[in-house]
């Protein structure tokens, strides 16, 4: 991913969110992860599906430009660029099974060269 090679600032991930989504819940608006000034240092987003959700129960992660829906499967790790190239949303969950995910971001740590870290 080009965003990793544009400069020599190291990346870190220090925020992890564990989420439980019930039927009808979730974040259904199309969005991308570095779209606000506060989040401008996000380079990559990551998510781990913590349980399986049957396809007929919805709850997948939709990626707009890729025309792709990823259905939750326990243990699956998803990693994507935080930029506008990967607009996404949480699909509507319709069944009785709640969806569990862990999610976070790789953040650029400006001001410290990656060479200093190595």
What are these regions (language model features)?
Residues 1-77, 85-118:
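Fe(II)/2-oxoglutarate oxygenase catalytic core
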């Amino acid at each position: 991913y080009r965003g990793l090679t544009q400069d020599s600032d190291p990346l870190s991930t220090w925020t992890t969110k564990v989420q439980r989504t019930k039927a009808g819940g979730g974040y259904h608006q199309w969005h991308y992860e570095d779209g606000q000034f506060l989040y401008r240092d996000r380079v990559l987003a990551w998510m781990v599906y913590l349980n399986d959700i049957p396809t007929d129960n919805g709850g997948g992660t939709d990626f707009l430009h890729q025309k792709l829906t990823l259905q939750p499967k326990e243990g699956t790790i998803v990693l994507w660029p935080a930029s506008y190239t990967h607009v996404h949303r949480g699909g509507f969950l319709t069944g009785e099974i709640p969806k569990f995910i862990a999610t976070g971001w790789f953040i650029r740590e400006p001001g410290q060269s990656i060479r200093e870290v190595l």
